[in-house]
Amino acid sequence: MNAETPEGSAAPPSPASTSAKTVTDKTNKKRASPSGDSEQPTKVTKRRAARACVSCRARKVRCDVVEGAPCGNCRWDNVECVVQESRRRKKNLLTASTAGQPVSTEAQLRCKTAASNPMGMSTADLRRPSSGSAISTSSIDGPSSFLSNSGLDNHVPHMIYQRSGYRHDPVLLNKLHSNDGNPQRPVWSNNLMTTPSVFDSLRTFRFISSLEEQDSTAQLPAFLRPLPTKIAAEDVKYLQIKGALSVPTLPLQNALLQAYVEYVHPYMPLMDLNSFLGIINTRDGQNGQTSLFLYQAVMFAASAFVDMKYLREGGYTTRKAARKSFFQKTRLLYDFDYESDRLVLVQALLLMTYWYETPDDQKDTWHWMGVAISLAHTIGLHRNPGSTSMAPAKQKLWKRIWWSCFMRDRLIALGMRRPTRIKDEDFDVPMLEESDFEIEVLADDNTVIPASCTLVRNLDMQRELAIMCISKAQLCVCISHMLKAQYSVLIRDKMKPENTTNSTMMLFPNKQLDNVEGVTEVDHELMAWAESLPTCCQYRTLTPLDVKDGRSTIAVQRTLLHMVYYTTISALHRPQFLPSSPLQAPTTSRQVQDMSRLRVRDAAMHITRMATELHQCRLERFLPTTGVTVILPAMIIHLLEMKNPAPQARERATRGFRQCMRVMEKLREVYAAADYATGFLDAALRKAAIDINASVGPSTLAMMKRVPVEFSAQTPPPENAPYMTAAESLFNERPKEHRPQPTPTMMPPNTVNAAALELSTNSPPQTELEESPAGLTPSVSAASEEIQLDVGNMDLDFMQGHDEFDWNAVAGTDFDVDQWLQFPPEGVTNQDDNLIAGVLGRGVEEPTMSAEQALNWAINAEADATARQPDGRVQGEVPAQA
C-alpha cells in the first residue's frame, strides 16, 4: 500500500473514519486541487498525504493523521502516534488537532523531540513494561493474544508490535473496550479529543520521558560508545525500532551484571572485570566508555542465569524470550558493523556461541565460534604475548581470551561433534597461571554489583575459581588429544546429487580401532589430570554449606568440571566396544573391550550422581549449555541398560534415567537443545518398547517416597515446551506384556558400537552412588539420611502436554552425541520403525534393524563376557571410587 489518500475524500473504512467529519476548513484547503478550483473533479487522482506519522511511514501504509491525532492505525495498534519534524522545511509539523482544536504546547514540544526519538520514549526505558507501550524486542511467541476483545479481533497489529515479551495492561484495555458499559464500542468512537482520553495521559508520560534525549546521536548512555558515523540514518532508525540501541531498566541491568560475574565470567574470563564494572558504575563516561555490542552480549549471556523475577519486571514472559531478545540485539549490532575493535569482537562473539535455537540454523554455535577464531588469528591472539612489548596487564588479558577461545572450541567439538577450529600446533600461548587472573576486590564505591554478591569482594573465592579455570583449560587439552585419538571428520549424511548442500561435517569414531596404545595414553593422561588436581578442584559431595554465603558458583563450576571429565572418558572408551564390523576379527582384546564398557558405565553413574546433587541443591539452573552436553550421553547409556534382562540392572538404569531427566527438564526452561534432547529420548524409549513406569520395583518406589520437604524433587513444567500431547506421552501408556524377541539374524551396522554398552545380567561395580539405601547419593541435608526423592511429586511424564516432536527439525543438534546418535538425514516421524537404527548407528550401505533387535543384539554380544566371571566383573577390576 502507498502512504496516500484519495484527494478530497474521506479516509478508507478504518478506525480513522470516525473522525473524518471533523476535518477543519484549513485542512480541506490544503488538500484541495493544485489548480485552486473549489469544485472537486468527478474522478480524483491519488497523491501523497500531507503528513504521516512515524509508525505508518515505517509500515508504508495510508495514514490519516491530518484528520485527527492519533491516526486510525495507531489507535488500533494501541501505540502512540508521533509526527516527525520535516527534514525539508526545517519546521515542526505538529500533531493535527480535530474540529479546529488548538494544538497544545505538549504536542509542540513532542514534535520537537520526535525526530530524535521516533518511538516517543526514553531509550533506557524501551524495555520497561508500561500500559502505553506496545513495543518489545523479543519475538518468540505469536501475536494471537495481542488483543482479545471482539471489537478488535479483526485487526492484526504490525509485526513491530507483535513481540513475545509484550504484556498489555488489562486496565488500559478495559478502558479502550468500554464506553458506558458497552464493550463493543471503543472510547474513541465519539468526542475522542474533546473528552479526557486515555491517550492524553499516555502521551504526556511519553512526552516527559522523551525530553531527556535531544538528538539521535545522544540516545545511548554516556558510558556506552556512540554509534559510528558510517552507519546510515535509516539503519540507525531500524536499530532503534528493533531495540538494539536500548538497554533494560537499571534493576535488570544490575541483576544481569551480577549473574554474569557469578556464572559466566568464572569459566570464560575474557574481560578485565573491575575496569568494565567501573565504567558502568559511573555512567557518565568519566571513567571511559565500553562497547554497546559487548554490553548487549554480556547481558545475553547472563540472561540464562538471572533471577526470573527481574526478567518479568523487565517485560519478558519467559527466559527463552529474554535470551532471544538480547541475542537479537547483539546480532543486529554485529550485522550493522557497530564494533570495529577486533578484540572486542572476539570477546562478544565468544559469548554469542552460547546461542542455539534450531538445528537448521546456519549461523549456529559452531558458526560464531569460527568467526571468533578467525578474528583472533588476524590480531595474533594465538601467539605468545610475552614476546611482545604490550603492557603486562594486556598480556594477561590476551592470554585469558585465547584460552577462552580454546576451551570453548574443544567443548563445542565434544558436544556438537564438529571439527575443532583450533589446531594444537597452530598456537604457542603458554598455559594459564594464577597470576594471569584479575584477583582483586571490587571498589567500595561501586554500586553496580549489590553487597549480596560475595564473589567480587572475596579474594579466596576468586582464587579458587581461577584455579578451576586453569584446570578446565588443562582438561580441554586432554579433550583435544582424545578427539585426535578416537575421532575423525566424516560426512554425516550420504551425499546426493540433488541434495549436496545439506550434509554436515561431523566427528565420528575412527573406522580402524587398532589404536589401543593411543587410547591408553590418553586414558593415563586423563587419570593423571584427575590425580594432580588442586585441593579446591577435587570433587566432593555437595552439602547445604556449598550454597551458602554466595559459594554456589564455586559448587557449580567444580561439579561441572568433573562432569566434563567423565564425559571425556565416556567419549574416549565408547568406540572400543566392538570392531568396525562384526564380520571382522576384533582388533582389541576382550579384556580391553570389557574394561572400556565398565569405564563408560562408571562415567555415566558419576555424571548421574553429580546431576542429582545439583538438583537437590537447586543449582542445576546455573548450568551452561554444556550441561546438556554432559547429561545426554549418560541418559542414553541408562536407556540402553533398561533392556537388560536383570531386574536390578533395569531398576538402576531407570532410576538414573529419571534423575537425569529432572535436570534436563530444568534445562529445557533455558536451552532449546534440551528440548530436542528430551523429544529425542522420548521417541527412543517408544521405539525401544521401554516402559519406564514398569521398570521400577515396588521396593524402590517405597524407598523413593521418603523425602524431606526441603529437597523435594518436584520439577515445575517448562514454560514453553510444545512437543507431545498427554495422550501421546510414553509414560501415559499402559504397561505392555513382555514379548521375547528372537535373536536377529541380520548383522548390526558398522557404527552400532555404543549399543554394546555394558548390559550384563549382573550389577556393576559398587560406587558411592549405590551405597545409599535406594542407590542414590546420600542426602545433602545434615539432619536426614533419607533419599531425596518424592515420587508422588516427581515429574515423570516429562513429555506430558507437549505437541508431537518434529523430527524433521533434528539435523545437527547441540548435544553430546556420537556414533549411535546419527540423526536421520531426512528426518523421520515417530511412526517410523527404523528410528533407533539411526540412534544406535546407521551404516552407509548396510541394512538396519529395529530398536529391540539392536538392543537385544547388544545384550547377546555381551553374554559370553558376562559368563566368563561369576560376578560379572572383569578379572583384575577394582571397584570404582567416588
UniProtKB/Swiss-Prot annotation:
The keyword Metal-binding applies. Its main location: nucleus. It is found in: Nucleus. Residues 1-20, 130-139 have a biased composition (Low complexity). Residues 1-49, 117-148 are annotated as: Disordered. The keyword Nucleotide-binding does not apply. Keywords: DNA-binding, Metal-binding, Nucleus, Transcription, Transcription regulation, Zinc. This is Cutinase transcription factor 1 beta. The gene is CTF1-BETA.
